[in-house]
Amino acid sequence: MELGRATKSWSIHTRSEIIGKYKVMERIGSGAYADVYRGRRLSDDLTVALKEIHDYQSAFREIEALQMLQGSPNVVVLHEYFWRDDEDAVLVLEYLTTDLATVISNAAKEGIPIPVGELKRWMIQILCGLDACHRNMIVHRDLKPSNLLISDCGVLKLADFGQVNLIALIIFILFGFST
């Protein structure tokens, strides 16, 4: 199984539509359904995260949710995506340098508490991101510190929407109308 996964992960480096627009750099994360690479957009040198999703349902849910949440200041930005039926989806996402799990771990190791004002600001940003989700009838279902990314200027954003429930889609399928 690992051999197959390694082969799939390598496909991001060989797909012409991706390498024609992006330089794929080091892998920065890996999970059950996806691998994430740091990348650089060739047209303007923008650093991005390239998320290769190996599971069809996770890819569908994440793309749908991020498209619905475009413009929300506390949700990671989806720049574009590449997806064909016979290959893994690759999402081009906003690159954020750290996550809340890393910040908490570093603070604990260094014995330096995170300032209360910073914690309050992040809590408000988490709630704003969740509010955007809930207004769009999206339930995240995988909120944890490692899925809360933080920019260099301290803005916290919700990420990893592969396990979401799209309530509006469920209502449409069950009842044939939208809310």
What are these regions, as identified by a protein language model?
Residues 122-123:
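Activation segment signature within eukaryotic-like protein kinase domains
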